[in-house]
Amino acid sequence: MSDLFSSESPVTLAQARTVAAGYQNVFIENLQPAGHFQIVIRDHRDHDSQLVWRNWNYESGANDALNSYLQSHGLKAS
């Protein structure tokens, strides 16, 4: 699948949870009472789990960047 998210923002929490469940290194962080959150991709080959990419769900272009980083850095869950 080339794109998991459409280019329209924001990413919903339900969408993010579905993707996070399908990848070993995708996380939802900083969940705010207003419903905003950050989608995070970390490099798990590293013992420190270094940050690869992070964006707020409502940021412009977040969907396109997330699709790109999932293709290049996403580790699918087994």
From Swiss-Prot:
S-S bridge residues: none
Keywords carried by this UniProt record: Plasmid
Pfam families: DUF905 (PF06006)
InterPro entries listed in its UniProt record: DUF905, YkfF-like_sf
Keyword Glycoprotein: no
SUPFAM superfamilies for this protein: YcfA/nrd intein domain
Protein family: Belongs to the UPF0401 family.
Protein name from the UniProt record: UPF0401 protein YubL
Classification lineage: Bacteria, Pseudomonadati, Pseudomonadota, Gammaproteobacteria, Enterobacterales
Gene that this polypeptide is encoded by: yubL
